[in-house]
Amino acid sequence: MKTMTSAEVRQMFLDFFKSKGHTVEPSQSLVPVNDPTLLWINSGVATLKKYFDGSVVPENPRLTNAQKAIRTNDIENVGKTARHHTMFEMLGNFSIGDYFRNEAIAFAWELLTSSEWFEFPAEKLYITYYPADKDTYNRWVEVGVDPTHLVPIEDNFWEIGAGPSGPDTEIFFDRGEIYDPEHVGLKLLAEDIENDRYIEIWNIVLSQFNANPAIPRSEYPELPQKNIDTGMGLERMVCIIQGGKTNFDTDLFLPIIREIEKLSGITYSPDSENMSFKVIADHIRSLSFAIGDGALPGNEGRGYVLRRLLRRAVMHGKKLGIQGKFLASLVPTVGKIMQSYYPEVLEKEDFIMQIIDREEETFNRTIDAGQKLIDELLVNLKAEGKDRIEGADIFRLYDTYGFPVELTEELAEDEGFKIDHEGFKVAMKAQQDRARAAVVKGGSMGAQNETLSSIEVDSKFLYEDKKSQAKLLVAIKDDELVDEVTGKAQLVFDVTPFYAEMGGQVADHGVIKNADGQEVATVLDVQHAPHGQNLHSVETTSPLKVGETYTLEIDEERRSAVVKNHTATHLLHAALHNIVGNHALQAGSLNEVEFLRFDFTHFAQVTKEELAEIERQVNEVIWQSLKVETIETDIATAKEMGAMALFGEKYGKNVRVVKIGDYSIELCGGTHTQTTSQIGLFKIIKEEGIGSGVRRIIAVTGQKAYEAFKDAENTLSEVAGLVKAPQASQIVAKVSNLQDELKAAQKENDALAGKLAASQSDEIFKNVQRAGSVSFIASQVTVPDANGLRNLADIWKQKELSDVLVLVATIGEKVSLLVASKSSDVKAGNLVKELAPFVDGRGGGKPDMAMAGGSNAAGIPELLTAVAEKLG
């Protein structure tokens, strides 16, 4: 077995399959593009689903990749086991209807055992297979595997409900009896017992059958197109080759661990039970790559995952004694380890470090807040005579504030409290079940559309044409090829001026005419067929025949509006880079007829001043009437020109570059104006957050922009009339004066409310009652608003009248309830929660003051009567 670095292992895998005629697919972003079923790219095949389901036909049916992936369902196991990671790399080879079982198995055996490649000892490799899959068993024997090293496993069948399915075969490496102290042997494999001896390194899935839950598996029909989907974990492979005890004892993690040693002053050992080194090393990799790919920490979705990873890493840093912020300092090390194949971490190093540093600083403040919550929780539990923190409370501290159970336990033990570990496990499992249920499982292929996949005719899109003569080559009706169509159908022509929806630009609409100039069909939509042809969805008014020539005419007014928005999107993107920063990467776009919508990565709201400058800059470029050039070239030349490749887009060898003067240059396959002046005008309508670390700008151009400005002008005129401002320029002064008058009136109102409260207080405070050792006042009062209740409570606080005050009032149709307490034995927040249901309300607050709102005034007498009972 050869000695290799992780970079060499990755490269050897790709080189091998390249030598077998595979195209190397570049690793895609961890943030899925146009796939709402995934939170993260979580496997090597996840970015290739479009090929397996037939929606797109690859230029080469043989593919290979090294794909970064994230899975966080079992985050708690990271650091505890030898091989759990949140971010990992999958090496894979894939066949889309090309080779199948025989070649896939032969390739795997050659790569692993040949002296030209990895040169694993054959006697160290064991194979599992599906018992009924005799073809796989026989093929392994044919390539040279000892039959005693072939282990049948009933679970070796890949299936998710109805649809593509098939057997899989897994390759394991035997690390020897040193990792099998009880000498269990092959039983570990046969009975699927968790162990460190037999390490799975490669799984080959044979997508062969069309599963149907209604019939036995043995009767599943075969798929018309059989596919191969394989996955090899790079971290496991490197661990075996480099002889590491765990995946962390390799060149993928050790440089990070060495930096953590310097920060903590503690020496790492593979035999040490201290998992903190491993947790930090794992999590900083995930954070660096995910943030580099445009995800940002937040409170939901993938942003929540990142925030949780960061907080977990910080807490483990504290366990190692690391003081202050430290995580960002590890990013350059991650970048250097991965730079040979993933240069983006070093390229975006400053931005990644800035985000991590800011988030860590925020969390350090959160820790202080969490400490206060724990203290408050313990005080309340003591008051209630309890000596145990319930699992639900532990989980809330863990889930919301990132407090590990160990830290909560340590703080609790200092105060003499026990921990409800079982309750915590129940809450944790419930969350994990919810997380797993939320994941829509997907496999290596979906339903295959044979009709669309069979269309291989040549068809060309004519960028410059608005109308063209075209021959009808293919007609599809109800998913079948036909020679003549009526009604709704899908058509492919030899050429077309109709743009197919792509890259955020909506499709062209228009009409189809016959040789006599009569309209015979309306084009409602245009999409790309699997082989790339423009597929026209139409509603016919007369029959259309394959082989005949028709005139295709786009709706020019619609196209004009769309291209204005598309070119303006390029200008907006450039302006964002100039004003907000280069980290403002496109995360989605839509160029419609009425508006443009642009999503971009940014960690804060764009300020009013920034929006004004963006709008000004875009309009300035529009009025300069810069030429919009389109250049067709190869991808390497385009990158040398400085063309920006957009987020999530995949480009072939030849690309179109859209260059707008010296202001903007991007790779783009869409249609555009000829000059910027044709856009006319640009107006931002809205800026908002749409998710963790993603902002959205909605804007309009041309006539729609003029209408937006006109609407604003009309609104301003109406406001001027309302505030009696002769000119629009005087509105601000008028409104400012009105605000001053309102403040003065409010001040006077507050003074009157205070006097009213004082006048009532003497009468209210006379009625002091007792419930056991607690004195209290409970009264219904008349106040103009909730502030009136607070005013009365303030007066009560200044006097030694009673331990507890309960005030209730009807304000409009609502009921307001206030509870105040000076007694350490009575928590206002708890009491208000007990009383609020009497008026169909709810509320809460602090131990000394709490409020609630309700809707049932009829319950007030019963509420007041219940006070004594609740305090007794």
Swiss-Prot record:
Gene Ontology MF term list: alanine-tRNA ligase activity; aminoacyl-tRNA deacylase activity; ATP binding; catalytic activity, acting on a protein; transferase activity; tRNA binding; zinc ion binding
GO BP: any one term: alanyl-tRNA aminoacylation
GO CC annotations on file: cytosol
Highest taxon of the lineage: Bacteria
Keyword Cell membrane tagged: no
Alphabetical keyword list: Aminoacyl-tRNA synthetase, ATP-binding, Cytoplasm, Ligase, Metal-binding, Nucleotide-binding, Protein biosynthesis, RNA-binding, tRNA-binding, Zinc
Cofactor(s) needed: Zn(2+)
Cofactor binding, note field: Binds 1 zinc ion per subunit.
InterPro entries membership: aa-tRNA-synth_II, aa-tRNA-synth_II/BPL/LPL, Ala-tRNA-lgiase_IIc, Ala-tRNA-ligase_IIc_anticod-bd, Ala-tRNA-synth_IIc_core, Ala-tRNA-synth_IIc_N, Ala-tRNA_ligase, Ala_tRNA_ligase_euk/bac
One of the Pfam families matching this protein, by short name: DHHA1
Entry function: Catalyzes the attachment of alanine to tRNA(Ala) in a two-step reaction: alanine is first activated by ATP to form Ala-AMP and then transferred to the acceptor end of tRNA(Ala). Also edits incorrectly charged Ser-tRNA(Ala) and Gly-tRNA(Ala) via its editing domain.
Compartments, as annotated in UniProt: Cytoplasm
Protein name per UniProt: Alanine--tRNA ligase
Record carries keyword Lipoprotein: no
Reactions catalysed, as given in the entry: tRNA(Ala) + L-alanine + ATP = L-alanyl-tRNA(Ala) + AMP + diphosphate
Enzyme Commission identifier(s): 6.1.1.7
Sequence similarity: Belongs to the class-II aminoacyl-tRNA synthetase family.
Record remark: domains: Consists of three domains; the N-terminal catalytic domain, the editing domain and the C-terminal C-Ala domain. The editing domain removes incorrectly charged amino acids, while the C-Ala domain, along with tRNA(Ala), serves as a bridge to cooperatively bring together the editing and aminoacylation centers thus stimulating deacylation of misacylated tRNAs.
Gene name of this polypeptide: alaS
Residues the entry annotates as binding Zn(2+): 566, 570, 668, 672
